[in-house]
Regions:
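Canonical positions in the second alpha-helix
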Residues: 25-26, 56-59
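Conserved polar/disulfide-associated segments of primarily extracytoplasmic proteins
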Residues: 111-207, 251, 256
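Surface-exposed amphipathic alpha-helical segments
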Residues: 104-108, 193-250, 256
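Structural register within alpha-helical repeat arrays
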Residues: 2-5, 9, 19, 38, ...
Length: 256
């Protein structure tokens, strides 16, 4: 096995940077013991750690849960991987539950339920939604990850989105009544977050799609848990998936 070979090679040198180099080879394949070694050996965030995290994120989008576990280990050690800071072209909008980095030129309105972001002639609606199950434990969150994969990975109009190891979801393209939309569902261990970009111009929608994805991935939670007051708001996102998938996922985070 590759890791044993790498351990052998790393043991043959006293050069710490060489040892890290060896373990990186295996860590970039989402091998958890190698990632654990990296976390033990590298004290602070470095460009190599950022690259490793990015590669693990790409692996996680293909359906490998060891990449999610590895990402979580890195996030706990290097917290800056998760907390996105605004760039010079962005501004921060926030409410009781989360904050977002949005383009400076956009017009944004936000309240505790959600809000809107206007980009040229397109509008992005966003909202927070209640989490229907408890997912504080890693094994419960991995069940949600697998449910999202089973639902969206086979769909050619959908894509898996990994903002971080505890902010996972999907992006879906749709056209209805000459309105083109791109919808994002992100699920954390605390809340659900929904984003919807709508435009009558398909080219404009596609042009802003990546911008909306960037906004969604910039989401940082405050830690507050959202509880829906209206019944209609309880039947969206993961709640809807759980209702339509009778395959044991309803047991996520619930006591026997």
């Amino acid at each position: 096995n590759l890791f044993k070979v790498i351990e052998y090679k790393a043991g043959k040198t006293s050069d710490m940077s060489k040892q890290i180099e060896f373990y990186m080879q295996s860590a970039k394949q989402a091998y958890v013991p190698a990632v654990k070694k990296i976390v033990e050996m590298v004290a602070y965030i470095t460009p190599d750690i950022v690259d490793l995290y990015r590669e693990l994120c790409e692996i996680a989008e293909t359906g490998d849960d060891s990449a999610i576990i590895s990402m979580n280990m890195l996030e706990k050690k290097y917290t800056d991987l998760v907390i996105k800071q605004p760039t010079s072209g962005q501004k921060v909008i926030e409410n009781k539950f989360f904050r977002l980095c949005v383009p400076k030129e956009s017009t944004a309105v936000i309240n505790d339920e959600g809000g809107t972001i206007k980009l040229a002639d397109s509008v992005v609606e966003f909202a927070v939604a209640e989490m229907p199950v408890s997912a504080d434990q890693e094994e419960d969150y991995l069940k949600i990850y697998k449910l999202i994969l089973s639902e969206y990975l086979p769909d050619e109009n959908a894509e898996i989105i990994i903002a971080n190891s505890r902010m996972i979801g999907s992006g879906m393209r749709e056209t209805k009544n000459n309105v083109h939309s791109y919808s994002i569902l992100l699920i954390s261990s605390k809340n659900q977050y929904l984003f919807k970009l709508s435009s009558r111009d398909r080219r404009e929608m596609m042009m802003f799609k990546d911008k909306v994805l960037e906004i969604a991935k910039s989401l940082v939670e405050t830690g507050e848990i959202y509880v829906a007051t209206e019944e209609a708001k309880k039947k969206i996102g993961l709640s809807f998936l759980l209702q339509s998938n009778d395959n044991g996922f309803l047991s996520i985070g619930k006591a026997e």
